[in-house]
Amino acid sequence: MRIGNKILVFIVGFCLPAVVLVSYCLGVWFDHRVELLRQDNVRHELANIQQQFRIDVDRLGFLTNIYASPLSHLDSEQLKSLESSWLESSMSGNLSWFILRDGNLQNVFQNEQPIAEANRQEIAKAITTQAKPEFASAYLIGDKGYVVTAVASHLGEYVLLVRQLTERDLLEYAQTSLVARVSMSNVVTAHHSSHSSSVALPSLISQQPIYLHVEFSDDPFRDVKLSLDWVSLAVILLGILIVALGYVWLRACLLQPFKSLMQQLALVDPMASVYRPVTSEGNEELSVLANRVNSLLARIYQQKERGKITLESIAEAVILTDIEAKVIYMNPKAETLLEVASSNAVGESLASLLKAGEQLNQAVFHCIRLGETMPQVAKIKLLTTMPRIIERSISNVLNHEKEIVGTVVVLRDITQEELLKHQLQKRANFDGITGLLNRQAFEEQLPEFASQARSLAVCYLDLEQFKLINDSCGHTAGDRMLAMVARAIQSCLGPQELLARIGGDEFGLVICDRTALAVAQLLKQIIAQVSLQVLHDKNCNYKVGLSIGVAFGRAPYINAQELLKDADIACIAAKAKGTNQIHIYDDKDKELTYQRNAPKWAVRIAQAIEENELLLYYQPIRGLGASSKRQRMEVLLRIQEPCGRILAPAQFIAAAERFKLMPEIDKEVIRKAFLWLSLNSQLWQDHCISINLSGNSLGAEGMVEYIAKQQQIFDIPSQCVCFEITETTAIQNRHRGMEMLRQLRKLGFSFALDDFGSGFASYGYLRELPVDYVKIDGCFVKNLAVNAKDYAIVKSIQDVCRVMGIETVAEFVENQEIIDRLQTIGINYAQGYAIGRPQPLASYCEQFETRLAQRA
């Protein structure tokens, strides 16, 4: 249906009925509002009538109160005078006075309206029953209504004022002309309309209710209500005429310009090579619509041109196909890559252009059939004049209804990228000097290589004298030697072996399914071949040797990575035996087991330091002569496991020294020992503790400053601390150690030379070292009582030290016989199990106080 007919249907079917319906609804609404106004006035008038009645009753009650006392006390003459005055007043019209005395109701004035005797008795009974000092109520006799007010004057007497209410009196209660009639009744008048209502009044007789029945007039509102007359019809006809004129105006001003615009839009071709805008006449809205259409056409043209320029400029080849995989467009790059003109390619199948067989067409059909939203990428070989590796991407083309109408095939020449990737992969996995696998590739291939073997031998090969070549001839010559060694090793291997360069001068070799004897023979052959390699440089000849560590594994318990670690440890043992040696890893070899576990111990030591698991023990040093003024003890170190087990230093000290952890251990021992001294100041006068300093700590940078800072923090006297250094450490770190000892001596600390006699020291070194004590090595002390040579050595050391002013300490004192011999020689102090076993340092004070108490 055309838009003009739609407008006509809208006017006839919607606008005209709407005009009639609105007119009718307005009339109904207005009548409803008038009715609401009438009901509101009725409620207001009822409330007003009730209020006026109460005001009238209150006024009568007030009047009764005024006259009650005089009427009950005046004599007959005075009553006559009062009666004449009352009758002459304007208030006496409908009012009558009565006195209730002895249960009888009597008129006060003779000329007042009489009340029947039965009614009088009923009024008297009601007043007597209520027994109130005053009250006001309504009373109905027949169709006549009265208002009765009573005031008690004496005991049992009441003065009553009775007013008869006529219909005129009742109508005067109303304030508007809305009330037509007011009457009194002792029943509620039933009414089925809202034109009358009833108001309850206080009744003199409780069993006889009295109501004011109010009737309302409908005349004031009848004139304002609307009804369907000729005026309403005229309004409806006028509305219809206006609607008809509006339709004519709409047809001329809107439909005709819109029809012209639609004719122009029907001729628009979005794919036209020339941009032609549409024009509009008539109104601003159609101009906006035309401008929006022109803007859309301009964007379509701009995007079409931009897409065309983009496709012609990009480096990728782009081919558009229809749903049958027939070519409908090719950009210039595709023409160059495929060596075919676009005009010749249109209509051809994609597979025939790329010379890829039906496989490519099937890929296109598969992409269309699945409705893929993501590009489908794959690599193909392009068989042109120069073969190329192409990355092709197929994407579906959708129309506005999300239907697939074709595909876009993007071809990218990745020949150079593939070559570069191959080179990078080779560099990532192979050593550039030897051409062998590097460590990363070796460790990646090792598990797979091991999974296919029944038995496995992992070998760790380390070159000897290779550093000499690098230092003497330079790294270029070293690289040449590495290449020569790699070729020599490869010449001995078959396809079932895996060889790699895993370090500077280190090689890894994996041998599968050979006996230990065959492996040993192969390795000896490799050593022989490597030994034959000679590097000529600067008129010099250089050779290298090999140290080989071997670790064996047998399926199914082959862990290649662990075997490589074991082979590395075995290689260290082979190097220790000399050049061109082979060592096979044996887990029963304690030294190899220690080498293997040393890294774990290093981690455990670092954890113990961090988590405060280092414990201090002490071993007493007893003076053997009367000159010993201070009680001495050596501070020993332990590690407490989380389970509570105590680890002796022999289990971890060697690992700490190998991984340079001793300075941190020494610092923690110093801190804990100084803390213990600071908490036990009662020991400062007569005690001295000995703390061992390792070779790594002797002369270490910052160690003197650390000791000085800890002394300052804990504020302990330096004469309570003696540092022990071993004889070998003092000689190996002679210059740095001497400087450190001098600085600490300035701070007041004393020093002891430990294990004296076990190393290479001479008395000349002893003369140079600023030590206060010499601890004689236990190897000379433990057999002192039965070995004359040991006795002579200990005696000579004691004689020299006495001359030099150095006190001596004998270690490993295990029985009383040794103590006696030491006293004979003149040794100053003794230390060993005969003196006391190591105990926790925290328990020393308690034991010391116990001994003092026992002595006392």
Curated annotation (Swiss-Prot):
Q: Which residues form the GGDEF domain?
A: 454-587
PAS domain location: 303-350
Might you give the EC number(s) for this enzyme?
Answer: 3.1.4.52
**What enzyme category does the UniProt record give?**
hydrolase
> Where are the coiled-coil regions?
none
Query: Where would you find the membrane-spanning parts of this chain?
Result: 7-27, 230-250
Keywords (alphabetical) are: c-di-GMP, Cell membrane, Hydrolase, Membrane, Transmembrane, Transmembrane helix
Q: Name one GO molecular function term.
A: cyclic-guanylate-specific phosphodiesterase activity
Q: What happens when the gene is disrupted?
A: Deletion mutant shows decreased swimming motility and increased biofilm formation under rich growth medium conditions.
Q: Give residue ranges for domain EAL.
A: 598-852
GO BP annotations of the record are: regulation of single-species biofilm formation
- What is the first-listed, main subcellular location in coarse terms? membrane
From the UniProt record, list the reaction(s) this protein catalyses. 3',3'-c-di-GMP + H2O = 5'-phosphoguanylyl(3'->5')guanosine + H(+)
Its subcellular locations are: Cell membrane
Signal peptide bounds:
none
What GO cellular-component annotations does this UniProt entry give?
Answer: plasma membrane
Top-rank lineage group of the source organism:
Bacteria
Does this UniProt record's set of keywords contain Protein transport?
Answer: no
Q: How does it sit in the membrane?
A: Multi-pass membrane protein
Q: Pfam families, per this entry?
A: EAL (PF00563), GGDEF (PF00990), PAS_4 (PF08448)
Q: What does this protein do?
A: Affects motility and biofilm formation, and is linked to the regulation of sulfate uptake and assimilation.
Q: What is this protein called?
A: Cyclic di-GMP phosphodiesterase PdeB
Q: Which organism is this entry from?
A: Shewanella oneidensis (strain ATCC 700550 / JCM 31522 / CIP 106686 / LMG 19005 / NCIMB 14063 / MR-1)
